[in-house]
Amino acid sequence: MNPTSNKSDFEELTTSLKDLAYSYLEKYSPSKQQLKVFLLKKYLTKIKGTTSKKEVSLIIDEIVNNLEKKRIINDELYSDSKARMFLKRGYSLNKINQSLRIKGIEDKFIKQSIEKIKEDKIEPDFVSALKLCKRRRIGPLRPTANREIFYKKDMGILARGGFSFELSKRV
């Protein structure tokens, strides 16, 4: 199936998008959604062909599906690695969930990653909250003279980090 009327234009567009995809994959480890968005943006800004967006998105989907079949892109591994990285940074499980959703990861992969984290660690949210406190020098790591003064501010920082009120009080 050839979505464009001119076969040489179609082949040229496909090869240029494949080249862009491979060069992007050399630099970064993206999810499927991130790669699709990147290729579409590059097409709209740099290539600017005569084919419609619908035809281009079909070509991009085909390229991404090919890469997934070749196991060059794997959203499950991406989800696991990002979830572990976010946990090391001090993200709460809620914030990890939200960040992965924004990156276009499927819900089943997100749930699997969070379950793996829960199996590995005892109270991952509490550990992450302590890491956040250490990084921002808030809560128990703030000088004792200033703790009561900055209590509300510290609670707000933890709440914006995705931690529950009870957990924030415990920290």
Task: State where each predicted segment sits.
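An alpha-helical, amphipathic repeat domain used for nucleic-acid recognition
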Residues: 1-171
